[in-house]
């Protein structure tokens, strides 16, 4: 893993990176349902979900969104930022759920930094355009702009 300064991150604008695959198991979906209180049958009841057009249980859209940090951490070519005291999620733009993620399927993130700004001395903000792909599917599960702030 390469280590770069926060300022050097600006030189990576437009450079695409791809994460490793992550399995979205039924257990993960069930735990997310418990954490959020969203127990709709399409997520947690395999027998009833078989009767839907999906044919199986599917991940919550917000579960898919919440995988962004895990996928970022599992991106082999992502640089490690030197001198960062902390990083925080600032928000998101243009979040769209384009296809359901079937239980026990695998997803990965394809991302690139599209904007980088110094907000004030020691505080930086960057926007990452991210697509979450489903293994074996031509249609992505989700697209989003993910905004992160880092401090040194």
What kind of region is each of these model predictions?
Residues 1-12, 97-152:
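HotDog/MaoC-like acyl-thioester-processing domains
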Residues 2-90:
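Hot-dog-fold acyl-thioester-processing enzymes
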């Amino acid at each position: 893993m390469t280590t770069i300064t926060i300022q050097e991150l600006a030189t990576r604008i437009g450079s695409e990176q791809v994460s490793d695959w992550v399995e979205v198991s039924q257990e993960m979906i069930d735990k997310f349902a418990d954490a959020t209180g969203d127990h709709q049958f399409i997520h947690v009841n395999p027998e009833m979900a078989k009767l839907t057009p999906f044919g199986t249980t599917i991940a919550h859209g917000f579960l898919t969104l919440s995988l962004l940090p895990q996928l970022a951490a599992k991106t082999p070519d992502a640089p490690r930022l030197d001198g960062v005291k902390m990083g925080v999620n600032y928000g998101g733009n243009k979040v769209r759920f384009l296809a359901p993620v079937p239980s026990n399927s695998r997803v990965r993130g394809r991302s690139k930094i599209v904007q980088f700004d110094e907000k004030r001395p020691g505080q930086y903000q960057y926007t990452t355009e991210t697509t979450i792909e489903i293994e074996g599917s031509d249609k992505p599960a989700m697209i989003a702009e993910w905004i992160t702030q880092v401090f040194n």
